[in-house]
Amino acid sequence: MRADFLEGVKAGFPSPAEDIHEKLDLIRLLVRHRASTFFFRVDGVSMVDAGMDEGDIIIVDRSVDPYNNCKAVCYIDGEYTVKRVEIGENSARLMPANEHNSTYKPIEVTPENNFIIWGVVTWVIKKM
């Protein structure tokens, strides 16, 4: 998808036609590795303080190596979830980001869990 890309947003009475800088290809901007990038719609409110609201679209890249405190889609015991991942030397903990709702608790990953970090969140797309 390509759209006009405007350099600045003026607070007065601008002429948008004068400010067209180039064509913006959203896929080129948002997707670095096509074969390993996936789009998900957020279902739930456990990550609102991380900027992921219900209904947002997250872009997840499976080729990005997970790192401590990354936001990632994880598979744990038959379910997918998006959380902030605390990665220790021999441990992992999935952290919600919603301080206003005590329903969401950290998930301690143990050797008994069927667990993988499926992919790292690289972008969040919101409707305003």
List the predicted regions and their residue ranges.
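Short, charged beta-turn/beta-strand-edge "cap" motif at the junction between a beta-strand
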Residues: S63-P66, G78-E79
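Structural motif
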Residues: G55-D56, C70
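C-terminal structural segments of small proteins and small subunits
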Residues: N101-S102, P106-I107, I116-G119, W123
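Short beta-alpha junctions and helix-cap segments that line functional grooves
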Residues: N69-A72, P106
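Short, positionally conserved secondary-structure boundary motifs
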Residues: M1-V48, E79-Y80, I87-R93, N114-F115, ...
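Short, well-ordered loop/turn sites that connect or cap secondary structure elements
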Residues: M52-D53, P66
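PDZ-domain C-terminal substructure recognizer with occasional recognition of PDZ-binding tails
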Residues: T81-E108
